[in-house]
Amino acid sequence: MKKRPLFLFMMLAIGIMMMPIAVFSANADTDVRIPQMKSQPIEVLVNARKVKFPDQKPKLENNQVLVPLRFVSDKLGGKLDLKGKEITIVKGDRTVNLLIGAKTAMANGKTITLGAAAQAVNGRTYVPLRFISEALGEKVEWDKVTKFVWIGSKEIPELMDILELKDIKPYEHYFKGQEFLMDLCYEGCKPATKAYVVSYDDLPFKVRGEAYYRLDMANKEGRVLIRATTTDKGVMGTGFALLNPKSKARYMPASNIAKENDGDFRFHYYLVSHPLDVESKDYTIDEADYLAIRADYPGYILIKNPFN
């Protein structure tokens, strides 16, 4: 009979160890178990490629997404002419007339209601998404999960189809003392000799069919994390590495701090620093030059650090 309490304790311990990691819905914005996100900028994509905004950025106002018109028009092949408050856009067989401050526009003589007035901010004209869809005749979709405005095709390209491989030698010094991190298992496991050098503006892209949409900073109880928005449904998630010229490369497996899903999206968290961890507590994300994806791919994927 004396052995029974010990047996029960062992069975309880085994049961706890076998419990699955909790999976949370990304819709639970106030759930304290989910790391808190820092501000996520809105991105606009035309045919799954980002539109670059050099000064004024897209914004959310009164539950409507507003975008700077000229850069979107240019990306769509439109010719924009501004005279005072009057804007004319010629795109293919479509001529659009818009007056700053008005809630309507004209497309080939047809009146279109915009829902929100066009506005001028620091020399840029902002329009609601309805203008892009109805006045310019484009398919437009707002994705509140990724904070992406999709215009046109949503077909995300494979990374190897948009970037060329480069020699990895100029980047080998980042792995000094951690050479094992250079190993990739693509057509056999061996040190990488090539690399894809990626700008953050190259996202989204696919790696072996899995999409990477964006990287963002998050925190939970003093822990600093990177959140990757992907379709990577692997239980462990693909590992990352932080490459810093002044310290050893740091491998970051996907953390079990939370498993967060929203439809086809998977959110993987990577621990940058922890206040109780001697090795990482003083590490700041801006120290890294690159965030490296350790995927089994023709070359190492080196993303220029978007956080420094």
Residue ranges and their predicted role:
Residues G209, G222-G237:
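Aromatic/hydrophobic beta-strand junction motif of beta-rich domains
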Residues F240-N244:
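Conserved aromatic beta-strand anchor motif in extracellular beta-sandwich/beta-rich domains
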